[in-house]
Design a protein with these regions (language model features):
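Catalytic cores of nucleotide-sugar-dependent glycosyltransferases that transfer UDP/GDP/TDP-activated
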Residues: 1-352
Length: 352
């Protein structure tokens, strides 16, 4: 398995892709697969055999092309058909790894529009693209998709609340207009409820948005927490009345919604992106078509059963389910035309 050189697995705080990859690595290892994880840094937090292409995480170069290309070049030097049966790539440049001597699938984690859509449209058919939601796939149906696999989360050690949370409404994301923290403030004030804005605020654009847009709106009813770690995030979710997801973009997935429901916390969200694929409105949350509906929904959502929310995640978005789905993709891609067995007698070796 190949991950970008700037991500730590599992993540110490915010990080949807990192959570997914960690859960998948551990899920595959639990099923008996030998998994090698190619990344940067020390990589000691998963069940995979870790191979680092750089001794230091490249988080200070996040989004730059050259470090990811260098990472991919080093990975390709270490991949051979004698060592691996399939490569699963999560990098942006992974879909262009056409010279690998081992079959490669690449999960697309971003929104496949604009320049990314143009790039992916030119991918060699020897590389299979996997979508993380039907919504994402519909945004670019002409791309060479081979499967759609919903992201999953490790649920084994998660604590689930037994009764609805009585704390503030929680917004948990990176500080940007797309994530709608300003809409969260307006909705909570309309409902007369306190709000916690807990989010990633590392990059210059995130800090600028917080300072210029969010901070002028703050009052005693809104608390801001920058970059909470994993333990703090879980505590916030367990205490929260609900998670609010007032997104303004066609988000391909939204891992935070799954994480919230896993703790028994329902989600109030705008009907954008993959929201209707993840939430069962009226059971695990409430989906609103317009921002004006968010306030009333925040008042109503406390009637939902935390146990139903958690059971929904265990059934539909567990790491085990994700690993099983990817097993089918691997086998179908390695042996086209063959129906992959549900429980293979011998497990292939997977390079992440």
């Amino acid at each position: 398995m190949v991950v970008p050189p700037w991500y730590e697995l599992p993540p110490p705080g915010y990080g949807g892709l990192e959570q997914v990859c960690s859960a998948l690595v551990d899920g595959l290892a639990a099923k008996g697969h030998e998994v090698t994880l190619f990344g940067a840094g020390t990589g000691t937090g998963t069940a995979a055999h870790f191979v680092g292409t750089d001794p230091e995480l490249q988080h200070h170069r996040l989004g730059q092309t050259l470090p990811e290309l260098a990472h991919l070049t080093r990975v390709n030097r270490m991949i051979s058909p004698e060592s691996f049966d399939i490569v699963h790539d999560h990098t942006t440049v992974g879909p262009y790894a056409t010279d690998r001597p081992v079959p490669t699938i690449a999960t697309v984690h971003g929104k496949p529009t604009g320049e990314l859509r143009e790039v992916l449209a030119d991918v060699d058919p020897k590389v299979g693209l996997v979508a993380i939601s039907h919504t994402q796939r519909r945004l670019a149906p002409e791309l060479p998709w081979v499967a759609t696999v919903h992201n999953g989360i490790s649920t084994g050690n998660l604590v689930t609340k037994s009764a609805p949370g009585m704390g503030p409404v929680l917004w948990l994301a990176r500080f940007s207009a797309d994530k709608g923290p300003d809409l969260a403030i307006e909705a909570c004030r309309a409902a007369g409820l306190p709000l916690v804005l807990a989010g990633k605020c590392d990059e210059r654009s995130e800090r600028r948005y917080l300072e210029q847009v969010v901070e002028p709106m703050l009052g005693p009813d809104v608390t801001v927490l920058r970059n909470p770690d994993r333990d703090a995030t879980v505590r916030l979710l367990l205490a929260a009345r609900c998670l609010i997801m007032p997104i303004r973009w066609e988000e391909p997935f939204g891992m935070v919604m799954v994480e919230a429901m896993a703790t028994g916390t329902p989600v109030v969200a705008l009907n954008r992106g993959a929201v209707p694929e993840l939430i069962r409105s009226g059971e695990t949350g409430l989906i609103c078509d317009d921002p004006s509906e968010l306030g009333p929904a925040l008042r109503e959502v406390s009637r939902l059963d935390p146990g139903v929310c958690a059971a929904h995640v265990r059934r539909e978005f567990s790491a085990e389910r994700m690993a099983e789905d990817y097993e089918r993709v691997y086998r179908a891609f390695v042996e086209p035309g063959l129906e992959p067995p549900v429980r293979p007698a011998s497990a292939p070796t997977v390079a992440w």
